[in-house]
């Protein structure tokens, strides 16, 4: 691979967007756990459960468990604690769950010596402003993200998932310790799939994003390592 973590570029999280373990492991076996992070979302976690997380840990990978908890505070407290018990590196909750829910998630991690990074999802990248209006949110998408970013920071979370074009503004408000994770990363030649907020890897570097999440651009590629090298080279 061309890439090492010594490069001053966003770190790469590979989203394991598969429907079966065999396909997932075919890709995982090509990756260096000292360089790449892995994301398990609702699909793979529902299919394979916590045992798959532990298997990836045994291979040396840091795992981002992207389950986007969004429920009453007590439920999120217990779910967060259960997730942290797996020894994961990062965990997501929905910022729109509100202050009490976010505080409950943070509280659930207090007993852990090395808790996972707790990250708030501000908005799904499949949504546009008209989608917000349809559910009664009348402010702009940009302002909505800024409000939820502030709420998440105030509640002591470690960072947010947000569209890349908001990253610089959020970094200027909350500093480098507040991590920015951005999905929807595509080379200009890639399909957008169902993502509405797309940026290129080069833009991700310019926007000071900490972690980029790359899924179907890699998982649907006939040569995922070649594609990863192209992405990495475009950020150097």
UniProtKB/Swiss-Prot annotation:
Assigned GO CC terms: cytosol
Pathway it works in: Pyrimidine metabolism; UMP biosynthesis via de novo pathway; UMP from orotate: step 2/2
Keyword Iron set for record: no
Protein name: Orotidine 5'-phosphate decarboxylase
Enzyme Commission identifier(s): 4.1.1.23
Function: Catalyzes the decarboxylation of orotidine 5'-monophosphate (OMP) to uridine 5'-monophosphate (UMP).
Pfam families registered for this protein in UniProt: OMPdecase
Gene expressing this chain: pyrF
Organism: Buchnera aphidicola subsp. Schizaphis graminum (strain Sg)
Assembly: Homodimer.
Example GO BP: 'de novo' pyrimidine nucleobase biosynthetic process
